[in-house]
């Protein structure tokens, strides 16, 4: 405990009501956030002679100030605690590093409903199925559904402005409701109902209805229709045979935990209508000395009580660990969801099987993560030895990408002790330079990146410049001219030139723009980490450049047409589904776009044709 913090005087002012407390260090930084049913009793426990753990001892030794917020109920305290944790990211709290919203499959409420992937708030009218663990799982499911039940997946702006069916209709992936006469209202509605049942886990009902329709078509001598329905039946059966399905058909999340070498993995299985939609592993940031019970309790609270997760609560949550506040958590989640949420820790039957699966996946993911970290650590240690540095905790690498000097993009990628830190990757659009001048581009991106205040923890130990002597000279000049408060001499600037024939393993490294460089053996772990970060930077730059080039390609031909400004250009591309759709459109179709007159439509039509 800080000598300047008077615990006895502070505790005299604390109430016995429920609430949340924030602990600050001498620098005014929040280092811990906690909740309590009885604030006075809970805070008093920090200042006893015998503390529960070394982590608590280290925490109390740094306390300079404590702020208290009283709440009406324990539920309010629980919610406020996790909001504060997300806001302050305190050093001594367990932190969930990934709180992104989960994607859903959206079936719209349009006259001719469409299927799409959806993230975020559910404002649009329609039905939502999920959550799925990631966007890939949704896209894979949508592609599968399109093959079995060919309902539309196009945007409404494209759908409303079509006069003839698109390629999806030609290859049998859409029934073509955009064009009158291609499919009856009854048939389209039937396919939509199949999708609804399928996504709700009612595969048996889908098969029963399809078999009945196939038999009817066969009896009516409609053999082509019967064969088409037969193919649908076989496709549905192939899908359902691949997946373990619980007999109960419940909605639940199953949370398994593994803990080793100071690292925790929490694995979540998403089960809806008895089907495993997918799973995801999380590696929360765990302060040293933290008990596993605190890891699980904090993770579950942050996972379900923060933002978008409150929208995806299942009816039941299975845990691999018995929580002391299990009842409070269940009551809080039920209150927020407006319905009963059960939290179970000792399931039987299928539920026990699910929990075992989650536990196994958590252990496997943790083993893989520790192995990866070990490899990264070995490589960074080897690099520090080669560069004669005490250690390398953080590296940043820069690369430039353009096409004949146009649409220049610079990338910055970041590695820490665990490898790529993708949340901190950045791209910079380079402007105001002579086209193709890579030196000026490097000069600009380095000034934008480092010519401002930087937190001490974000100052890299090594800055890698992809490009060799010339680019390294630019970096040296920039750092010599920087007027900043942080230690600009701390980062080591290292140039990397590609070898002969641009082959991996033949790179030359430079400490200075003048003089000879040096090379590392192809099997050197230090070289491997340099290659890894350089390749990441190169890929990140090219990805940004391609996006920028595609954007220009889609608009450049329209920019030359008099009377077409940014708003009209955007409207045309939106309603026509892109530049290709606009090129294929007739004058009458173009004239239907809001803000486009008949005369302007003719001008656009002939400009794009010639």
Curated annotation (Swiss-Prot):
Database matches in InterPro entries: GIY-YIG_endonuc, GIY-YIG_endonuc_sf, GIY-YIG_UvrC_Cho, Hlx-hairpin-Hlx_DNA-bd_motif, RuvA_2-like, UVR_dom, UVR_dom_sf, UvrABC_protein_C
Domain GIY-YIG: 16-94
GO MF annotation terms: DNA binding; excinuclease ABC activity
SMART domains reported for this sequence: GIYc, HhH1
Source taxon at top rank: Bacteria
Similarity field: Belongs to the UvrC family.
PANTHER family per UniProt: UVRABC SYSTEM PROTEIN C (PTHR30562:SF1), UVRC/OXIDOREDUCTASE (PTHR30562)
Protein name stated in the entry: UvrABC system protein C
Organism whose genome encodes this protein: Escherichia coli (strain UTI89 / UPEC)
Lineage per the UniProt record: Bacteria, Pseudomonadati, Pseudomonadota, Gammaproteobacteria, Enterobacterales
The gene coding this protein: uvrC
């Amino acid at each position: 405990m800080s000598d300047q913090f008077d615990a006895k005087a502070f505790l005299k002012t604390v109430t016995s009501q429920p609430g949340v407390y924030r602990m600050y260090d001498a620098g005014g930084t929040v280092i811990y956030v906690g909740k309590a049913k009885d604030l006075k009793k809970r805070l008093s426990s920090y200042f006893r002679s015998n503390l529960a753990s070394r982590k608590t001892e280290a925490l109390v030794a740094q306390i300079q100030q404590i702020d208290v917020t009283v709440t009406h109920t324990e539920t309010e305290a629980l919610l406020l605690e996790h909001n504060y944790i997300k806001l302050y990211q305190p050093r001594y709290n367990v932190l969930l590093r990934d709180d992104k919203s989960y994607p859903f499959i959206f079936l719209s409420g349009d006259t001719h409903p469409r299927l799409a992937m959806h993230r975020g708030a559910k404002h649009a009218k329609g039905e939502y199925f999920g959550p799925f663990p990631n966007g890939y799982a949704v896209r894979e499911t949508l592609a599968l559904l399109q093959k079995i039940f060919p309902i539309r997946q196009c945007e409404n702006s494209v759908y409303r402005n079509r006069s003839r069916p698109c390629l999806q209709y030609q290859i049998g992936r859409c029934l073509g409701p955009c064009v009158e006469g291609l499919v009856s209202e009854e048939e389209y509605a039937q396919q939509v109902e199949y999708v609804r049942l399928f996504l709700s886990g009612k595969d048996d009902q889908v098969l029963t209805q399809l078999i009945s329709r196939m038999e009817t078509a066969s009896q009516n001598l409609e053999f082509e229709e019967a064969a088409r329905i037969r193919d649908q039946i076989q496709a549905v059966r192939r899908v359902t045979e691949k997946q373990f399905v619980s007999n109960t058909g419940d909605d639940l999340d199953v949370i398994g935990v593994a803990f080793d070498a100071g690292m925790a993995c929490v694995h979540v299985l998403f089960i809806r209508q008895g089907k495993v939609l997918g799973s995801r592993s999380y590696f929360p940031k765990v302060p040293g000395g933290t008990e596993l019970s605190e890891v699980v309790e904090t993770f579950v609270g942050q996972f379900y009580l923060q933002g978008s997760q409150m929208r995806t609560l299942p009816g039941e949550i299975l845990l691999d660990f018995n929580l002391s506040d299990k009842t409070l958590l269940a009551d809080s989640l039920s209150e927020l969801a407006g319905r009963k949420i059960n939290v179970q820790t000792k399931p039987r039957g299928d539920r026990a099987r699910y929990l075992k699966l989650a536990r196994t996946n958590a252990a496997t993911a943790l083993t893989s993560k520790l192995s990866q970290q070990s490899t990264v650590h070995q490589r960074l240690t080897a690099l520090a030895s080669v560069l004669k540095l005490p250690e390398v905790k953080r590296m940043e690498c820069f690369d430039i990408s353009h096409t004949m000097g146009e649409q220049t993009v610079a990338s910055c990628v970041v590695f820490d002790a665990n490898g790529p830190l993708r949340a901190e990757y950045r791209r910079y659009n380079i402007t105001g330079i002579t086209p193709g001048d890579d030196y000026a581009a490097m000069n600009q991106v380095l000034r934008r990146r480092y010519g401002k205040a930087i937190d001490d923890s974000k100052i890299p130990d090594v800055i890698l410049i992809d490009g060799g002597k010339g680019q390294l000279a630019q970096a040296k000049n920039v750092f010599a001219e920087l007027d900043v408060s942080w230690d600009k001499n701390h980062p080591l600037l290292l140039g990397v030139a590609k070898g002969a024939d641009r082959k991996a393993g033949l790179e030359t490294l430079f400490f200075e723009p003048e003089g000879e460089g040096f090379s590392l053996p192809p099997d050197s772990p230090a070289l491997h980490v340099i290659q890894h970060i350089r390749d990441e930077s190169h890929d990140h730059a090219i990805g940004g450049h391609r996006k920028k080039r595609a954007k220009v390609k889609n608009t450049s031909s329209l920019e030359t047409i008099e009377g077409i400004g940014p708003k009209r250009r955007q409207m045309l591309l939106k309603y026509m589904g892109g530049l290709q759709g606009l090129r294929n459109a007739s004058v009458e179709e173009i004239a239907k776009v809001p803000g486009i007159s008949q005369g302007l439509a003719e001008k656009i039509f002939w400009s794009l044709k010639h």
